[in-house]
């Protein structure tokens, strides 16, 4: 690979993409930030708008409109482009149309001579990330999905509101599909080493509160989409967090979507959200959380759904 730097190319300047661009500029994560979209006038306007704010960025960043040839020397290509999720539509129902869009985008990126890392956010993210890995032949650690980073943040936030602590003080994870079969790992969720599940049960006298928090976490996107059309701030910040871990070589453990290789019950090939060490070499090490028998069964179900869905679009791997 080429020498590692901090050039990021964003493909997709919709609500998620533009929110991500704003987050990256305000955090000063990239040195060079290129935006690609078929809506060239919007890109031009967003670039102008963002550059006007770079004086307030914590470090210099050059924002520009670009084309696919700009991917040649990019360190990180982030793809948010795709058909949006409609009210009532599941992420998996998006699969065929967004896989076709993704294939076209990735072919153009690879044709540029790109030799960096992919970060995928378009839905269904686990399926599309696996598709990119298999279509390009890149090592799994260099093809990363946003996974359940956002879902885990939602869970942490809801728990924090119930327990009266800061979200950052909550150690809790959503793993599996970024979607309807995701699961909360209650057996490991804690605040200062104290079980969240047990605390909720003690406070309420029942197990219903934990289930309510899980359901509200799982279904948050549907509620937001129904009210305002799409989700973008939360996922944009999650993407910024992953990008920062890569570009700054932070060695952070994040629940990104990555390919399993025998972990969590011997599963191989499937991409889904699990705790993974992320640094300038990509998603380099999966951490295998101890799961209860019930949690393992739910995880296996998530794997099965994702495997079956991927099988339905495998034909698109052929040129």
Curated annotation (Swiss-Prot):
<dbReference type="InterPro" id="IPR015955">
    <property type="entry name" value="Lactate_DH/Glyco_Ohase_4_C"/>
</dbReference>
<keyword id="KW-0560">Oxidoreductase</keyword>
<comment type="subunit">
    <text>Homotetramer.</text>
</comment>
<protein>
    <recommendedName>
        <fullName>L-lactate dehydrogenase 2</fullName>
        <ecNumber>1.1.1.27</ecNumber>
    </recommendedName>
</protein>
<keyword id="KW-0963">Cytoplasm</keyword>
<dbReference type="Pfam" id="PF00056">
    <property type="entry name" value="Ldh_1_N"/>
</dbReference>
<dbReference type="GO" id="GO:0005737">
    <property type="term" value="C:cytoplasm"/>
</dbReference>
<keyword id="KW-0597">Phosphoprotein</keyword>
<dbReference type="InterPro" id="IPR001557">
    <property type="entry name" value="L-lactate/malate_DH"/>
</dbReference>
<dbReference type="InterPro" id="IPR022383">
    <property type="entry name" value="Lactate/malate_DH_C"/>
</dbReference>
<feature type="modified residue" description="Phosphotyrosine">
    <location>
        <position position="222"/>
    </location>
</feature>
<dbReference type="InterPro" id="IPR036291">
    <property type="entry name" value="NAD(P)-bd_dom_sf"/>
</dbReference>
<dbReference type="GO" id="GO:0004459">
    <property type="term" value="F:L-lactate dehydrogenase activity"/>
</dbReference>
<feature type="binding site">
    <location>
        <begin position="121"/>
        <end position="123"/>
    </location>
    <ligand>
        <name>NAD(+)</name>
    </ligand>
</feature>
<feature type="binding site">
    <location>
        <position position="37"/>
    </location>
    <ligand>
        <name>NAD(+)</name>
    </ligand>
</feature>
<feature type="active site" description="Proton acceptor">
    <location>
        <position position="178"/>
    </location>
</feature>
<comment type="similarity">
    <text>Belongs to the LDH/MDH superfamily. LDH family.</text>
</comment>
<dbReference type="InterPro" id="IPR011304">
    <property type="entry name" value="L-lactate_DH"/>
</dbReference>
<feature type="binding site">
    <location>
        <position position="91"/>
    </location>
    <ligand>
        <name>substrate</name>
    </ligand>
</feature>
<feature type="binding site">
    <location>
        <position position="231"/>
    </location>
    <ligand>
        <name>substrate</name>
    </ligand>
</feature>
<feature type="binding site">
    <location>
        <position position="42"/>
    </location>
    <ligand>
        <name>NAD(+)</name>
    </ligand>
</feature>
<keyword id="KW-0520">NAD</keyword>
<dbReference type="InterPro" id="IPR001236">
    <property type="entry name" value="Lactate/malate_DH_N"/>
</dbReference>
<feature type="binding site">
    <location>
        <begin position="151"/>
        <end position="154"/>
    </location>
    <ligand>
        <name>substrate</name>
    </ligand>
</feature>
<dbReference type="InterPro" id="IPR018177">
    <property type="entry name" value="L-lactate_DH_AS"/>
</dbReference>
<feature type="binding site">
    <location>
        <position position="104"/>
    </location>
    <ligand>
        <name>NAD(+)</name>
    </ligand>
</feature>
<dbReference type="GO" id="GO:0006089">
    <property type="term" value="P:lactate metabolic process"/>
</dbReference>
<feature type="binding site">
    <location>
        <position position="68"/>
    </location>
    <ligand>
        <name>NAD(+)</name>
    </ligand>
</feature>
<feature type="binding site">
    <location>
        <begin position="123"/>
        <end position="126"/>
    </location>
    <ligand>
        <name>substrate</name>
    </ligand>
</feature>
<dbReference type="Pfam" id="PF02866">
    <property type="entry name" value="Ldh_1_C"/>
</dbReference>
<keyword id="KW-0346">Stress response</keyword>
<feature type="binding site">
    <location>
        <begin position="82"/>
        <end position="83"/>
    </location>
    <ligand>
        <name>NAD(+)</name>
    </ligand>
</feature>
<comment type="function">
    <text>Catalyzes the conversion of lactate to pyruvate (Potential). Contributes to S.aureus growth during nitrosative stress in both aerobically and anaerobically cultured cells, despite playing a secondary role in this resistance mechanism.</text>
</comment>
<dbReference type="GO" id="GO:0006096">
    <property type="term" value="P:glycolytic process"/>
</dbReference>
<comment type="pathway">
    <text>Fermentation; pyruvate fermentation to lactate; (S)-lactate from pyruvate: step 1/1.</text>
</comment>
<feature type="binding site">
    <location>
        <position position="85"/>
    </location>
    <ligand>
        <name>substrate</name>
    </ligand>
</feature>
<feature type="binding site">
    <location>
        <position position="16"/>
    </location>
    <ligand>
        <name>NAD(+)</name>
    </ligand>
</feature>
<feature type="binding site">
    <location>
        <position position="146"/>
    </location>
    <ligand>
        <name>NAD(+)</name>
    </ligand>
</feature>
């Amino acid at each position: 690979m080429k020498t590692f730097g901090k050039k990021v190319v964003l493909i997709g300047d919709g609500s998620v993409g533009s929110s991500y661009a704003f987050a990256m500029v305000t955090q000063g994560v990239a040195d060079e930030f290129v935006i690609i979209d078929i809506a060239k006038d919007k890109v031009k306007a967003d670039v102008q708008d963002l550059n006007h704010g770079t004086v307030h960025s914590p470090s210099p960043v050059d924002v520009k409109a670009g084309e696919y040839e700009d991917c040649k020397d990019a360190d990180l290509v982030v793809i948010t482009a795709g058909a949006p999720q409609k009210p009532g539509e599941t992420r998996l129902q998006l699969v065929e149309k967004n896989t076709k869009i993704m294939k076209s985008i990735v072919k153009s990126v690879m044709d540029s001579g790109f030799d960096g890392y992919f970060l995928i956010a378009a839905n269904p993210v686990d399926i599309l990330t696996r598709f990119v890995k298999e279509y390009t032949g890149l090592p799994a650690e260099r093809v990363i999905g946003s996974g359940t980073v956002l879902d885990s943040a939602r869970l942490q936030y809801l728990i924090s509101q119930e327990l009266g602590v800061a979200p950052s003080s909550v150690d809790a994870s959503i793993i599996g599909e970024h979607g309807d079969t995701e699961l909360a790992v209650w057996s490991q969720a804690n605040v200062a080493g104290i079980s969240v599940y047990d605390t909720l049960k003690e406070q309420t006298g029942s197990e219903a509160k934990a289930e309510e928090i899980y359901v509200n976490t799982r279904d948050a996107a549907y509620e937001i989409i129904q009210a305002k059309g799409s989700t973008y701030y939360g996922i944009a910040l999650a993407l910024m967090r992953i990008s920062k871990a890569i570009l700054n070589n932070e060695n952070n453990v994040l629940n990104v979507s990555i390919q399993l290789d025998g972990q969590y019950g011997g599963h191989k090939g499937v991409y889904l959200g699990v705790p993974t060490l992320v640094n300038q070499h990509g998603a380099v090490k999966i951490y295998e959380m101890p799961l209860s028998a019930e949690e393992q069964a739910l995880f296996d179900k998530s794997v099965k759904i994702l495997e079956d869905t991927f099988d339905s679009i495998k034909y698109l791997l052929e040129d």
